[in-house]
Structure formats: structure tokens, C-alpha cells
Amino acid sequence: MFGRNFPFFNSIGGFYPRESLDSKRPSGSGYTSKVRVRDKYHIVGFISSGTYGRVYKAIGKDGRKGEYAIKKFKPDKEGEIIQYTGLSQSAIREMALCSELDHPNVVQLAEIILEDKCIFMVFEYTEHDLLQIIHHHTQPQRHAIPAPMIKSILFQLLNGLLYLHTNWVLHRDLKPANILVTSSGAVRIGDLGLARLFYKPLNSLYSGDKVVVTIWYRAPELLMGSRHYTPAVDLWAVGCIFAELLSLRPIFKGEEAKMDSKKTVPFQRNQMMKIIDIMGLPRKETWPGLVSMPEFSQLQSLAMSRGYINRQCNLEGWYQSCLKNNGYSPGSAAGTPGAEGFDLLSRLLEYDPTKRISAREALEHPYFTTGTPVTANCFAGYEGKYPHRRVTQDDNDIRSGSLPGTKRSGLPDDSLMGRAAKRLKE
């Protein structure tokens, strides 16, 4: 269905021949048995941890050149007793999809290793992610990400997303921390833990995962409780990322309401308010499917209580203010995304998912086809330097020289490789 036999867009348009990527892909992709991690990789240090395990930076041994990020899945645990009860659905999906997907704008899996009942996913190493880059541009004082860099990042992101969607894969967790960037300026979509196939599903996507996409990047149809959704949810997230690259802060920074003890999914009232503040109140005249949404009555209640009935879209006002505050103009060092940038943003942040622009349509938008040409290296022409990813030795697994079988926990559920700068709780 995908990967090995499918042609795809390259990062500057056109299609890659199948052979060109196979020759670049690390050999041995997929499951490897009776191999020890330390026999093949030198562990440089610890990157990050989270719910499901830990991530380490490593260098290949014995002619296996390059740097790698090794993601270690921990076994389930009760107290001090390790219970080998299996892997999470998220881990299984990520391994299955990453073993098949093969595109220059999707993170590359080198191999999977099973050692002492621990599973390791070995990925190519990426030095940066968009969250780290955004954070860098806010320190020590705010300075805009150059418009040509944003254009390249966005094009490569959409290019990878087109490949996923063409191969019936929804990512469902696009956000700056999950968009990786190599030191040579190549953008990779990472963390496929929430990704899933959407080709003729036996049940609604909602029945399998009731909550998807980090709250600030969650599409309105998801907030409205839609049981059926499409690749459009990923395009809304791209719009949020585009806005964040421009403004250096999340455009819809709401507070998430947590599930109750009965695991009932609550209406995300605060997040919907943040969207309405800028996008105006969604209306059935422009979004016919709105009235059939499970949370429509909640939206009506919100509109009445907050005086949102007459709230109109002010995205253009937000956009112009963003350009002014961050110094985007035709004669500035940062350049400008121009009117084309606003038009693309407005089509990505379209309330009605049936009208929202697709990845393929977005790649053909005048924002990319006019003005400064898109570069395959997003850092091209940029004279600044971004800090390297933070790698430490402060980890029991490293100090003990034993990666598998430890009692430590963690693995980033929000980033394949971790990140240098941690954001406030998302």
C-alpha cells in the first residue's frame, strides 16, 4: 500500500525514482534478532524521556557511519516488579508504519532491535526541531524567523504530509516538537505514535482513539466531537504551525479540560474560545456539517454566554499585527510572507474540513510558486546558528552501561528525539 513501491514528490517538486531513496536508506531496516544495541552503536548520551521509555543519541560502530537516535520502549511495570505484558498500541503502530514509510520528509527508521525483552527503534539523528528553533528566536530578544526559511519548512512539511496522506496515513499529532530538522536543513515529520491508516476502517477513527492531536493544534471538527474525520485534521495543525513560525507563539493557546473518572471526553470549551477569538464564531451557513456535530449544543451555549454571537473572523488583523510586530516587510532582513502567505494560512485554518485546503493543493499555492524560490535546505542564506540538541550523561542506563532491563521509565510521547527546550505543559 505504501513505502516501497510508491513514487512520491521530492522536496523541490517532481518525483524521486524508487532507486534513489533505497540507496540512501540504512540497510537492515525492520526487525533484527539476536543483536545487542551496544554491539552496533556507541551510546553518546541521554536526550529525553516520557511515558513509554527513553531516547538516546548514538554513533554507529564497525563501518556503520552516522549519528542515530535510539528510542527504548520500557516494559510495563508494577512497583519494583517488571511485568512483561506487551507493548502499547502507540508503539506497535509506530514500528509498523515506520518500517514501511520511506520519504525524505518523514523520519527514517534504520532498524528495530529486540534485546532482553526491551525493544529499541533506531532512527536517523536530527539536530533540531521546530520547537527548539522557535524558542531560539525568542531568546534573548524576539527576532523573526526569516520568511524564506518558513517557506522552505512549510513546503517540506506539506511534502511529507502529502506522502503520508497519499498512502492513507493520518499523522494526528503534528506540532512543532514533532517536526524535526537535520543540520543540513532537511525537514522530517517525526513521532508517528498516534498515526494510523484510514483506508476503509472497520470502525470510526473515534472509536479507537477518542482524543488525538495536542490541544493547541486540534482541529475544530475534533473539538466539536466528530466521530469521523479526514486528513483535514492534519492540515489544520499545519496552519497552526505556520502561524506559530510567524508569531513565535501558539496562535490558539487554550487550556485542556481533562477526562473525568468515567473517561468521558469533555467539551474543550477554553480551546474553542481561543479559536473563536481570532477566527470568529463558526456558522452553519459556511459550515453545513456543524449542526450535526455532537458538541453543537455546547457551542451554542458558549456563544450565548460569552457574547460570541456576532464575533467575526479577525485572522487578517492578527496576521498584519504579527508581520508588524516581528518586522516582516519587503525591505527587511526577514523578508515577508506577503499576501500569499495570508491566503494560504486562511485556507489551512478553514473551519469546514470539506473546504480546507489539501496538502497537494497547498503545495501548488502561489505562496510557493511565486516570489522567493523554495529551497531544499531551509537554512540556506541564514547566517545565524541554532544550538545543538542537549545530550547529557545524567542517566542510570548510561552510567551502568546497561540499556535494557532497567527499572527507569520514560520516552517522549511528544517527540521522537526529544527537544532542547521544554514547553509549558501542552
Swiss-Prot record:
Domain of life: Eukaryota
Region (Disordered): 390-426
Reactions mediated catalytically: L-seryl-[protein] + ATP = O-phospho-L-seryl-[protein] + ADP + H(+); L-threonyl-[protein] + ATP = O-phospho-L-threonyl-[protein] + ADP + H(+); [DNA-directed RNA polymerase] + ATP = phospho-[DNA-directed RNA polymerase] + ADP + H(+)
Protein kinase domain location: 41-368
Keywords: Activator, ATP-binding, Kinase, Magnesium, Metal-binding, Nucleotide-binding, Nucleus, Repressor, Serine/threonine-protein kinase, Transcription, Transcription regulation, Transferase
GO MF, one example: metal ion binding
PROSITE patterns (UniProt xref): PROTEIN_KINASE_DOM (PS50011), PROTEIN_KINASE_ST (PS00108)
EC number(s) reported in the record: 2.7.11.22, 2.7.11.23
This protein's GO CC annotations: mediator complex; nucleus
Positions annotated to bind ATP: I47, S48, S49, G50, T51, Y52, G53, R54, V55, K71
Catalytic site: D173 (proton acceptor)
InterPro entries assigned to the protein according to its UniProt record, in alphabetical order: CDK (IPR050108), Kinase-like_dom_sf (IPR011009), Prot_kinase_dom (IPR000719), Ser/Thr_kinase_AS (IPR008271)
Chief localisation class: nucleus
Keyword Transferase: yes
Enzyme class, first EC level, given as a word: transferase
Cofactor(s) for this UniProt protein: Mg(2+)
Subcellular location: Nucleus
Job of this protein: Component of the srb8-11 complex. The srb8-11 complex is a regulatory module of the Mediator complex which is itself involved in regulation of basal and activated RNA polymerase II-dependent transcription. The srb8-11 complex may be involved in the transcriptional repression of a subset of genes regulated by Mediator. It may inhibit the association of the Mediator complex with RNA polymerase II to form the holoenzyme complex. The srb8-11 complex phosphorylates the C-terminal domain (CTD) of the largest subunit of RNA polymerase II.
Family of this protein: Belongs to the protein kinase superfamily. CMGC Ser/Thr protein kinase family. CDC2/CDKX subfamily.
Subunit comment: Component of the srb8-11 complex, a regulatory module of the Mediator complex.
Protein name as it appears in the record: Serine/threonine-protein kinase ssn3
